[in-house]
């Protein structure tokens, strides 16, 4: 399954919507406007199971769009994708089928987001899920709904218990930049603004860390939580 213009649409707020174009070109599908988030409900080739794939994710600040779509599919159909995969133009993910799951290896100049199925929404606008940023330089395995690295990647060492101010999650490459700065500084997490909401990314005792060949930062087992901005839980 992939994020694309299709026949089923879920309206969401403007910061997560597609760019201008289809209305001006008079090419919007019937009943769809530019502020609708749309997806192709029949899915793709289903080569690796029920996963949702989107492109230019960090470059065009689409991480929250991808996660929002995952939660909306669950809300509308009762069953969502097992994972959401976020690629960029200069990154790739090689997926190899194995008897005990999928082997995953990122390559390129950045890396790949892998979001697990989100929990139920914690309020009108919020959600919690587990995510991983797969940078080049390590091989991971997806099995039974969880990611495991297959090398000797060390556990993430927290050197600063504070939450790093990550800026705006809806700026291009904003979330990825905040995550990498968090890892370089050894912070316990990072918090970002997101259209009046607050996005918190926290490490866990299960988080493993590695650095890619071009300085990319790879981290597993992160908890991402979107909540009202007034909620300052740490």
Feature-to-residue mapping (PLM):
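C-terminal and late-domain segments of enzyme folds
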Residues: 17-234
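Catalytic nucleophile loop
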Residues: 1-12
